[in-house]
Amino acid sequence: MMRCKICGKQEIIAKELGVCADCIKQRPEEAKPFVIQAHRKSRRRFGLVEEPPKKGVECKLCVNNCRIPEGEKGYCGVRANINGRLINLAGTSKAVAEWYYDALPTNCVASWCCSALDKSYPLKNLAVFYGACTFNCLYCQNWSFKENTLFLAPKISAEELASKVDENTYCICY
């Protein structure tokens, strides 16, 4: 139990936020600084920019519309301004990504999507996780992508990833 930093109510509160759900919903302007600080802290830990940059070369690849300063990276961590030009640090010839096999049925695929229920094992899913994201969900179950973004590794080409598919790979989830 924690005490809300806004209303003082004592209840179950996310430690990183310090404010209760009621205040986030009913007093958003007061809660916003706490939420923003938590987001910044979650990115700072991995050496990522804390918010989309606003001064520099404009990147239009996502909703963040970063303006990336010379020698810096955008919010995603895989676009950089080098000598006044936007450069892809990953994603063209090789993506920052990890993969693994997940036996079907798996929690990332609705049961009706795969025939594992009909044909059973050894069918599997090829689960692919990209090492960059334009969101910053505080409690993302796949938070470790931030480490991949920081180090721009591991990298894998489309051909290498495609080679992981075999006769028992029923689907691919990203």
Where are these regions (language model features)?
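Short metal-coordination and nucleic-acid-contact micro-motifs, chiefly zinc-binding Cys/His arrays
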Residues: M1-R3, E16, K55-E58, E72, ...
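Short, exposed beta-strand "edge-strand" segments with a Pro/Gly-rich flavor and a Y/T-containing core
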Residues: I12-V19, L150-I156
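Conserved Radical SAM active-site core
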Residues: V78-Y174
